[in-house]
Amino acid sequence: MIKNECEKDNQLAARLAKLAGYEKVNGFYKFVNTPEKEMENLGGLLKIVKNLFPDSEEQLLSEYFLELDPNKKCARQSVEYSDINQWDTLTDKIIINLCNSKNSTSQEWGKVYSLHRKLNKNEISLNDAIRESGKCKIKSAEMLFFSNAMLMYAYLNIGEFGLMKSTSKLLEFDDLPEGFIKESFKSRVSMLEANISLNENSLLEARQHSNRAIENSNVNRICFFAYLTIGNTLIFEDYDEAKKAYIKGQKYAKNPVHQEMLDGALCFLSNIWKKENQWVNYNSDNIKYLQLRAFYYINQGNIEEATEILDELSSRDQDENELGFYYYYKGLISQDKTDYYKSIRYFKKSDDKYFIQLPLLQLERMGADLELLNLISI
């Protein structure tokens, strides 16, 4: 398809060659005219596909990735691009190809990404993943790096931000060869570090990490979460700037899950600032979106509807962070300091130093002692 496009436009080949990193257009022509020829650095091909076929990227790359020789570098790079995009079905197929290859490095990549996928699907525990990666006797710099980085996602899922931070210190970018994989790993780690900073209420750092992720990546998923995080850091500070960041993220919300998350962020922002709210999710049974709906009803003065939702949630298995929000919303209805103190307790248990501001601000408005509030928020 790239060859066909170049035949339509004589100047296109030169532009694409430059985009893909070729010093001379002849090298690019050799690639497009030789079906079995693979680019040494997958990043060049990705830029071309995004430039020419932005709406067909997943379909075209899925077909191409599965045709790659699993013994070669390009196939190993393809598993990273597929995984970072969360093209899970494709990723699993590439992993099988790598594991069944004759190349020991490809086999190693297949094993490590297989562990990463099993962790994501909760098919193995963190301890099992650490033990199994140790058995792999990893030799490549890329997989030594990724076998640690993948643990940070698992720690994020269970709210272990301290372990995320200590693991991030094990990551050595200087050991990685220059090219697509290094840049992709940089964008991954930047977003993980942004999550750590947001949790620690280090908002400027969180924005810096997020902007760095955007600079290092053209992956929709990474850019989406980067703008989402930037917006989250601005929730209490500036309604317009937070909304602007979320709207920028809209461009990268390419699947229903991301769109739902974005709508949830806009809903929460509108609730906090008591603005007109067109993002309330009236259909989801997810705890987060039920809580947001209750928050909206509270703002509307529809206490009966809000109470009904919170009563329903009282019998649900909410995690500690969700309980922090739950008791905050209960406090908005009851105006009972006890609910706000419970909210603080659960936000502290979940190590959330950012959203703990919600009950603290309410208690301050109710005349609670500032020194006491500062003490209990530590």
Curated annotation (Swiss-Prot):
BP GO annotations: latency-replication decision
Keyword entries, A-Z: Activator, Latency-replication decision, Transcription, Transcription regulation
Keyword Transmembrane in annotation: no
Recorded phenotype for the gene knockout or disruption: Knockdown results in decreased AimX transcription and increased lysogeny.
Entry keyword annotation includes RNA-binding: no
Superkingdom classification of source: Viruses
NCBIfam families the UniProt entry points to: lysogeny_AimR
General function of this protein: Transcriptional regulator which is part of the latency-replication switch system that decides at the onset of infection whether to replicate and lyse the host or to lysogenize (latency) and keep the host viable. Activates the transcription of the aimX locus. Transcriptional activation of aimX seems to lead to the productive viral replication (lytic cycle), aimX possibly acting as a regulatory non-coding RNA.
Subunit record text: Homodimer. Interacts with the viral arbitrium peptide, this interaction changes the oligomeric state of AimR from an active dimer to an inactive monomer leading to lysogeny.
Name assigned to this protein: AimR transcriptional regulator
Organism: Bacillus phage phi3T (Bacteriophage phi-3T)
Gene: aimR
